Amino acid sequence: DALPIYPATTLMDLIREARAYEERTGETHTESVIATSMEEADIERLMNWPHTNLCTDGGLIASHPRGFGSYPRFLGRYVRERKIMDLPTAVHKSSGLAATHLGLRDRGVIRPGMKAVFVLFDPNRVLDHATPEAPQALSVGIEKVWVNGEIVFEDGGATGRRPGQIIRW
């Protein structure tokens, strides 16, 4: 008879393996879990809840597709293809509503004196291509990105400018 396998035990085993790998190779941040436990219908209902804002917890090390594809996936698959909400609502949930929920008073709306990230995208083309196997695959339909007035992405790539700042609250 096989012993039962508990999720917590499996997680601890994975963490131990990741730590051992890091010690052998010198690499860091090697452990990653991509959970796929939600049904699409539940995700769509949650996205449409009036209080849901769209954010991502992608980090500096792009080892998860959300770092390169969260918003293009939302805009392309859910807004354009599945039509779960209109584009202005989607943009508000990704900007103004998110800033309000996070208490970021100097962001989230277009107004003089506010800090801003502007994304020029084609709503008919925007779509993610990042996968767990290729987490840094660029999305399509993103033309330019400005951060605090400086272009940081154009012509299919980063410009090298880094005018953003860490937000601590």
Sequence positions of predicted segments:
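Active-site microenvironment of metallo-dependent hydrolases
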Residues: 2-169
